[in-house]
């Protein structure tokens, strides 16, 4: 399931993030440092070094925002979230086709299974040319270039790439989530069911039917979830 989540960061948060990243200086390093065996040969970008003060500060801003975002919670069903990273593409930089690594190691040494990949756009689309996130999924090839503050979530199993940036700079945050439900198909069904329940709540539909659907949702989540 590929899902666009709008307005994850507000204007004030975007201003703060951009200001801190503009001032990051030597914290920007070669992005190949975090790429795996498959990704390193096709990756040309810059990243904020992991575990630096600016990475932790801005990562906390993003984590606080997604924890309050009901659409993100419903669609992703997060169990563990990898600390957000930040990248920059400019001057022809790109990231060729690749699939994200299956496992990342959290700062505390705990391993995280990458079920869901997340990109949060920090630059406005008008500020750069190129830089589309191209995702190949079961419905074909999707090109993604969203307003600043908006997020795209998609299965980490997807083949994807970032096209060359030919003007300006494309700055974004990216990270991975281990979901309570590892199957994308099952997560999508639960998301559709939760969306239907919310619509029933808003329409004041038959309460017995609504309670029944809520019960089915939680029983499926209980059956499929891993904690």
UniProtKB/Swiss-Prot annotation:
Binds 1 Fe(2+) ion per subunit. The keyword Cell division does not apply. Pfam families: 2OG-FeII_Oxy_3, PKHD_C. Its cofactor is Fe(2+); L-ascorbate. GO terms for molecular function: 2-oxoglutarate-dependent dioxygenase activity; iron ion binding; L-ascorbic acid binding. Fe cation binds at residues 98, 100, 160. 2-oxoglutarate binds at residue 170. Its EC number is 1.14.11.-. Residues 80-179 form the Fe2OG dioxygenase domain. InterPro entries: Oxoglu/Fe-dep_dioxygenase_dom, PKHD_C, PKHD_hydroxylase, Pro_4_hyd_alph, Pro_4_hyd_alph_FE2OG_OXY. One of its GO terms (biological process) is intracellular iron ion homeostasis. It is an enzyme of class 1 (oxidoreductase). The keyword Kinase does not apply. Keywords: Dioxygenase, Iron, Metal-binding, Oxidoreductase, Vitamin C. This is PKHD-type hydroxylase Bphyt_7102. The lineage of its organism: Bacteria, Pseudomonadati, Pseudomonadota, Betaproteobacteria, Burkholderiales.
């Amino acid at each position: 399931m590929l899902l666009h989540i709008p307005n994850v960061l507000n204007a004030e948060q975007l201003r703060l993030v951009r200001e801190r990243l503009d001032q990051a200086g030597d914290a920007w390093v070669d992005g190949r440092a975090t790429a795996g065996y498959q990704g390193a040969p096709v990756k040309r970008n810059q990243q904020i070094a992991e575990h630096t003060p600016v990475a932790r500060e801005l990562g906390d801003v993003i984590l606080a925002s997604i924890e309050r975002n009901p659409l993100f919670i419903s669609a992703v069903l997060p169990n563990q979230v990898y600390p957000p990273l930040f990248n920059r593409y400019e001057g022809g930089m790109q990231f060729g086709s690749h699939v994200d690594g299956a496992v990342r190691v959290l700062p505390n040494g705990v391993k995280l299974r990458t079920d869901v990949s997340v990109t949060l756009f920090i630059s406005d689309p008008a500020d750069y040319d190129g830089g589309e996130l191209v995702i190949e999924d079961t419905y074909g090839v999707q090109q993604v270039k969203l307003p600043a503050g908006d997020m795209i979530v998609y299965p980490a199993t997807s083949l994807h790439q970032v096209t060359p940036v030919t003007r300006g700079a494309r700055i974004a945050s990216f990270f991975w989530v281990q979901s309570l439900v590892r199957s994308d198909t099952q997560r999508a069904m639960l998301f559709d069911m939760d969306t239907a329940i919310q619509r029933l709540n808003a329409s004041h539909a038959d309460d017995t039917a609504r309670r029944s659907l809520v019960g089915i949702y939680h029983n499926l989540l209980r059956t499929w979830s891993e904690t």
